[in-house]
Structure formats: structure tokens, C-alpha cells
From Swiss-Prot:
Family classification: Belongs to the SOS response-associated peptidase family.
Organism: Bacillus subtilis (strain 168)
Biological process (GO), any one: SOS response
InterPro entries: SRAP, SRAP-like
Residues found modified as Thiazolidine linkage to a ring-opened DNA abasic site: 2
Source superkingdom: Bacteria
Organism ancestry: Bacteria, Bacillati, Bacillota, Bacilli, Bacillales
Notes on the domains: The N-terminal catalytic Cys-2 residue forms a thiazolidine linkage to a ring-opened DNA abasic site. Glu-106 catalyzes reversal of the thiazolidine linkage; self-reversal is favoured by duplex DNA formation. Glu-106 is also involved in sensing abasic sites in single-stranded DNA (ssDNA). His-163 stabilizes the abasic sites by forming a hydrogen bond with the O4' hydroxyl group.
Activity regulation text: Formation and reversal of DNA-protein cross-link depends on DNA context. Catalyzes formation of the thiazolidine linkage in presence of abasic sites in single-stranded DNA. Mediates the reversal of the thiazolidine cross-link in presence of double stranded DNA.
Residues of the site described as Required for sensing abasic sites: 106
A GO molecular-function descriptor: peptidase activity
Site (Required to stabilize abasic sites): 163
Protein name: Abasic site processing protein YobE
Amino acid sequence: MCGKFTLFSEFDDIIEQFNIDQFLPEGEYHPSYNVAPSQNILTIINDGSNNRLGKLRWGLIPPCAKDEKIGYKMINARAETLAEKPSFRKPLGSKRCIIPADSFYEWKRLDPKTKIPMRIKLKSSNLFAFAGLYEKWNTLEGNLLYTCTIITIKPSELMEDIHDRMPVILTDENKKEWLNPKNTDPDYLQSLLLPYDADDMEAYQVSSLVNSPELIESH
């Protein structure tokens, strides 16, 4: 799964790397060493002409949901079953997004009683993009709430020693294809969702401190 990640890159770097044409005011971007579910997170969609940067709440709420609490159970979606699950089938065809990040965390189990936090990133330290889906939900007050989920896949060689799942990190080419609203074939879209090349990534143990620059330092 993916339950925590970081995004502390410069705002201008995000705009440039993801070819953003429309974006929220820079003052609404808050770098974080501990991006977590239920937070409003930076996301990118394509409207057919432009890449747009905005915020969606992390934890997808299907339109048919009667209670927003279901979002806490839907922070991730399995790549292999997107086309089969009612909550993900429709957004797979028409509501795809990417989530910028510069690393993510996972807990590695050493024994039945011991787990240690690991930080996983690109060796280049570059920004990358998680594959995601989004939806809109009518609240009980009649307001629209936009939410998202991060897609996971079987682990790479690097990740399999840490966890049995990993978030889908899109290559530059697949990132464009994933955002392209003209792509609607579920088989093709699912073919873009692959474990990222383990040779281009690294993982190391970090502190369990929350929302601190020290969280990303090797221990």
C-alpha cells in the first residue's frame, strides 16, 4: 500500500516538470515531509487541452457512498482489479490523475513485533508521479467533495523485501498517456501500470519523527 509520502520540492519545479498550464496560487502549496490520507493533496489532471494543478482529498469516496468515512478505506486501489471494481471502473475511463511526490514511506517488518520506517525515492532525487483516480461526491449538505486514490501494484525487486505492494510510479511517457482523456480502453490503461524499475530507486531506514526534515535522513 501507500499511506505516507513527501512533497517538499520547489513549487516552480513542480510547475515545470509536469508542464502545468493552470494551477492554484503558490501560497496554497505547503511542502510536507508527511503527506497523509484525508489531507488535501496536490494532484494533476488534463482537461483535454491543459495540465491543471489543484487539490483533491486523499481517500476516494464513490458517488454512491452514504458516508464519507469510506474514504479512509480507499486511499489505495489495486491496479490489477481496477476494471472489475464498481468504485474504480468509471474513473479508470474518465477520471484519472497523477500525484506529484519526491519519496514515499513504507514500514518494513523485521519480525512479528518489530517494524522500521523506510524511505523510498528515485536515485536521482527527482520528482515523480503516482498514478491515481479521482471522483466527486455530494456531501449531506449538498456540496461537492473531490477525492482521489493512489494506485498500487505488485512490488519491484527493491520493494519486495519491504512490502508486498508498491505505488504505481509512472514513466514520463506513461504519465502523458495516463493523463490523456482520449485514452479510455481499460486494457490499455492498465498496461501502463507497472512496477517502477528497481535499478532507478533506493530505500533506506529513517526516523519515525512526524513532519520533520529529519524524517528523510538515513538512520
